């Protein structure tokens, strides 16, 4: 797991850029390895990024509750927007990007670098686009940004490791779960 306080060249899908605010964003990457056979199976390989996004959604909701916070009552849902965006009530809270990287000397597994960017404590006027959201704008009683970042990251890593182990065991079952 790699967490950063500042990102200078954030990017998203299709060469889009990701703008983060130092000290106010969640910028975390996790490297996992998966069997090459999964990556070659076009019926399931696209689900890895969605699984990572789903687990991030679960981590955000769980971490807010774990830290004693709550969501504003007008918030309907935090949801995934295919293929990699995390949205809350039509506004982008963040995104997930997964990239495959070969592992030198290993023919049966590949590395997947899963990066996540979230707006944690970015003030409304500093959000990069009109349709953006920040966790502090939709939730209340949140702790310091560093505490929130660590709580989300810890939940995400736990959930994702468990889900990826299940996916590796039976990728077709997990892709539709």
Model-derived regions, located:
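N-terminal lobe of the biotin/lipoate ligase/transferase fold
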Residues: 1-76, 94, 102, 165
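Short beta-strand segments
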Residues: 3-5, 29-31, 81, 97-99, ...
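Short, glycine/acidic-enriched loop or turn micro-motifs at the edges of active sites
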Residues: 8-9, 88, 118-120
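Residue-level signal for inorganic ion chemistry
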Residues: 28-30, 56, 85, 117, ...
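Glycine- and Gly-Pro-enriched alpha-helical subdomains that act as flexible
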Residues: 81-82, 87-88, 92
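Short, acidic (Asp/Glu-rich) active-site segment that either coordinates a divalent metal cofactor
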Residues: 105-142
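Conserved, helical-rich catalytic subdomain that frames metal- and/or nucleotide-binding sites
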Residues: 140-177
């Amino acid at each position: 797991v790699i967490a950063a306080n500042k990102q200078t060249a954030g990017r998203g899908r299709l060469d889009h850029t990701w703008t983060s605010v130092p000290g106010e964003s969640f910028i975390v990457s996790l490297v996992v390895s998966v069997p090459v056979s999964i990556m070659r199976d076009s019926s399931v390989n696209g689900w890895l990024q969605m699984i990572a996004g789903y687990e991030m959604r679960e981590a955000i909701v769980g971490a807010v509750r774990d830290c004693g916070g709550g969501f504003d009552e007008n918030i309907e849902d935090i949801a995934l927007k295919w293929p990699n965006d995390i949205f809350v009530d039509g506004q982008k809270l963040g995104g997930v990007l997964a990239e495959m990287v070969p592992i030198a000397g290993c023919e049966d597994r590949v590395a997947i670098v899963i990066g996540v960017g979230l707006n944690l404590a970015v003030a409304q006027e500093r959000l990069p686009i009109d349709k953006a959201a920040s966790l502090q704008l939709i939730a209340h009683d949140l702790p310091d940004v560093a505490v929130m970042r660590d709580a989300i990251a810890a939940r995400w890593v736990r959930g994702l490791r468990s889900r990826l182990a299940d996916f590796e065991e039976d990728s077709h079952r997990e892709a539709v779960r």
